Amino acid sequence: MDSLTSAASVLAAALAVGLAAIGPGIGQGSAAGQAVEGIARQPEAEGKIRGTLLLSLAFMEALTIYGLVVALVLLFANPFA
């Protein structure tokens, strides 16, 4: 693998992880804030809100994991080599 392809792969992997973390990070913060606000308004619904929050956080975190998988593929199983 030449140095240009190697450098481009490292840059693409860094962008994949970085950009894949921005959206879910903002979404998780917003969802957690809304959940806290909802629990403060209706404390009796805390269990249902928390369950829904944890499920939605898991789905959001999956997007970041997909970005990590793309980065690992670019670094270790480079399709451009």
Swiss-Prot record:
GO terms for cellular component: plasma membrane-derived thylakoid membrane; proton-transporting ATP synthase complex; proton-transporting two-sector ATPase complex, proton-transporting domain. The chain crosses the membrane at residues 7-27, 57-77. It is found in: Cellular thylakoid membrane. Keywords: ATP synthesis, CF(0), Hydrogen ion transport, Ion transport, Lipid-binding, Membrane, Thylakoid, Transmembrane, Transmembrane helix, Transport. InterPro entries: ATP_synth_csu_bac/chlpt (IPR005953), ATP_synth_F0_csu (IPR000454), ATP_synth_F0_csu_DDCD_BS (IPR020537), ATP_synth_F0_csu_sf (IPR038662), ATPase_proteolipid_c-like_dom (IPR002379), F/V-ATP_Csub_sf (IPR035921). One of its GO terms (molecular function) is proton-transporting ATP synthase activity, rotational mechanism. It comes from the Bacteria. Coiled coil: none annotated. Pfam families: ATP-synt_C. Its main location: membrane. The record marks E61 as: Reversibly protonated during proton transport. It is a multi-pass membrane protein. The keyword Endoplasmic reticulum does not apply. F-type ATPases have 2 components, F(1) - the catalytic core - and F(0) - the membrane proton channel. F(1) has five subunits: alpha(3), beta(3), gamma(1), delta(1), epsilon(1). F(0) has four main subunits: a(1), b(1), b'(1) and c(10-14). The alpha and beta chains form an alternating ring which encloses part of the gamma chain. F(1) is attached to F(0) by a central stalk formed by the gamma and epsilon chains, while a peripheral stalk is formed by the delta, b and b' chains. F(1)F(0) ATP synthase produces ATP from ADP in the presence of a proton or sodium gradient. F-type ATPases consist of two structural domains, F(1) containing the extramembraneous catalytic core and F(0) containing the membrane proton channel, linked together by a central stalk and a peripheral stalk. During catalysis, ATP synthesis in the catalytic domain of F(1) is coupled via a rotary mechanism of the central stalk subunits to proton translocation. Key component of the F(0) channel; it plays a direct role in translocation across the membrane. A homomeric c-ring of between 10-14 subunits forms the central stalk rotor element with the F(1) delta and epsilon subunits. Belongs to the ATPase C chain family. This is ATP synthase subunit c. It comes from Synechococcus elongatus (strain ATCC 33912 / PCC 7942 / FACHB-805) (Anacystis nidulans R2).
